[in-house]
Swiss-Prot record:
Belongs to the universal ribosomal protein uS19 family. This is Small ribosomal subunit protein uS19c. NCBIfam families: rpsS_bact. It comes from Cycas taitungensis (Prince sago). Keywords: Chloroplast, Plastid, Ribonucleoprotein, Ribosomal protein, RNA-binding, rRNA-binding. The gene is rps19.
Length: 92
């Protein structure tokens, strides 16, 4: 179910403060965050945000098409693995 339009989008306060300070100074730095649930807002466009995937921080460059999505959508947590091969030669 989608979030109510009466409410504002969730953005972690510390991340939003860092982005606003960088926008005022006109700087571009990598912002490290563990907040995967934060919604991407227009103030983030053009910044690189390193999102934690459970093991490491993955740098993500924010574009205008990402606005409205969550940061966690762009940092996959699972590695797709296939099934083990049932090769009879490897058993011998």
């Amino acid at each position: 179910m989608a979030r109510s339009l009466k409410k504002n989008p969730f953005v972690a306060n510390h991340s939003l403060r860092k982005i606003e300070n960088l926008n005022i100074k006109k700087e571009k730095k990598i912002i490290v965050t563990w907040s995967r649930a934060s919604t991407i807002v227009p103030a983030m466009i053009g910044h690189t945000i390193a999102v934690h995937n459970g093991k490491e921080h993955l740098p993500i460059y924010i574009t205008d098409r990402m606005v409205g999505h969550k940061l966690g959508e762009f940092a996959p947590t699972l590695i797709p693995r296939g099934h083990a091969k049932s090769d009879n030669r490897s058993r011998r």
